């Protein structure tokens, strides 16, 4: 059970980081125009 919880947290973190990277890349592309 604890291992599953740790993996859930890692999944949430990876999704959050990927989302942040995409958003920052999109804003950077918009600002460049």
From Swiss-Prot:
Alphabetized Pfam families for the sequence = YtiC (PF23685)
Record carries keyword Membrane: yes
- Keywords for this entry? Cell inner membrane, Cell membrane, Membrane, Transmembrane, Transmembrane helix
Residue spans crossing the bilayer: 10-29
The reply to whether Oxidoreductase figures as a keyword in the UniProt entry is: no
Q: Where in the cell is it found?
A: Cell inner membrane
* Record's bilayer topology term: Single-pass membrane protein
Q: What happens when the gene is disrupted?
A: No effect on iraD expression.
Induction profile: Expressed at fairly high levels during late logarithmic and stationary growth (at protein level). Expressed at low levels in stationary phase (at protein level).
Question: Can you list the GO cellular component terms from the UniProt entry?
Answer: plasma membrane
Record-given protein name:
Protein YtiC
């Amino acid at each position: 059970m604890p291992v599953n919880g740790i993996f859930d947290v890692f999944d949430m973190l990876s999704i959050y980081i990927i989302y942040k990277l995409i958003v920052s890349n999109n804003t950077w592309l918009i600002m460049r125009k």
